[in-house]
A protein has these predicted regions:
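Short, acidic/polar
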Residues: 43-57, 107-115, 171, 221-223
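Conserved anion-binding
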Residues: 25, 34-38, 104-188
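A general structural detector for well-ordered alpha-helical segments in enzyme core domains, enriched
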Residues: 50, 54, 82-86, 111-115, ...
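Conserved N-terminal beta1-alpha1 strand-loop-helix module at the mouth
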Residues: 1-67, 72-85, 89-93
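A C-terminal functional module that forms or caps the active site or interfaces directly
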Residues: 189, 193-225
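Catalytic beta/alpha-barrel core
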Residues: 66-67, 72-75, 94-97, 101, ...
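Short, well-ordered coil/turn segments that N-cap beta-strands
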Residues: 14-18, 60-63, 92-94, 122, ...
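Surface-exposed amphipathic alpha-helices with a cationic face
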Residues: 8-12, 84-91, 139-141, 179-182, ...
Length: 225
């Protein structure tokens, strides 16, 4: 079953739009372990325990899982084995989106092969600044998808994303350009922002695309507008 079908069926089945991260962040996990009397365990053991607990608690309430590749790479070979365990723990019918924010053109084909053939991931996040060629190797795989990051919530990114002016900022140029790279079933957009107006501007430019939202929780009361 392809990514898009899995995603839409999980949304319908679980009546949710929640995408849950599976990020073994050392600072977060150490705090979590101390509060449960598990501080004497190895970090790898903690990560396994935490990931399994999160999946078991959320499997009926999410439409996708999204582990950040960098946290697993930082652990070395055991981290990549842990990512493979994540793939095995995620229930069938729930897509796995690997949050790689990949932007290196030379390694795209190799990463696409690893993620989609070896790991069995369903989608990957990409950084778009290298242009269409960054997405092409991933879109060669049928039934898989890419998620293009078009806006970051990081305050330091503002001067880049909103250049040269608010009437025609870079982030909207990215939204317009990348839609030509793949169909709505192949290419989604990720929007990180605490400003609902930015989300609204992206939606106006991309009315048919699925959007993955980040950093918008504090603005819940303003989303309907």
């Amino acid at each position: 079953m392809g990514f898009f079908v899995q995603l839409t069926e999980a949304i319908s089945r679980h009546q949710t739009l929640l995408v849950t991260g599976l990020d073994p962040n050392p600072e977060m996990l150490n705090t979590w372990a101390q509060g449960r009397g598990m501080g004497n365990r190895s970090f790898l053991s903690l990560a396994r325990h935490w990931i399994k607990a999160v999946i078991e608690a959320t499997a009926d309430h999410v439409c996708a899982y999204k582990p950040s590749l960098g946290f697993y790479q930082a652990l070395g070979p055991v981290g990549l084995e842990l990512l493979r365990e994540v793939r095995e723990l995620v229930p069938p019918g729930i897509p796995l989106i690997v949050d790689a924010k990949h932007g290196d053109l030379n390694s795209s084909s190799a990463l696409a092969s690893y993620l989609f053939r070896d790991l069995g991931a369903d989608a990957v996040t990409l950084s778009p600044l290298a242009g269409q060629d960054i997405a092409a190797p991933f879109l060669l795989y049928p039934q898989r998808a890419v998620v293009v990051t078009c806006h970051s919530s990081n305050p330091a990114a503002w001067r880049i994303q909103h250049h040269p002016n608010e009437q025609d900022p870079l982030f909207l140029r990215v939204v317009r350009e990348c839609q030509s790279w793949g169909t709505p079933e192949q290419l989604l957009l990720e929007v990180g922002t605490s400003d609902p107006e930015i989300l609204a501007r992206v939606r106006r430019e991309a009315p048919e695309r699925f959007l993955i939202l980040r950093s918008l929780w504090a603005e819940e009361d303003r989303l309907d507008a």
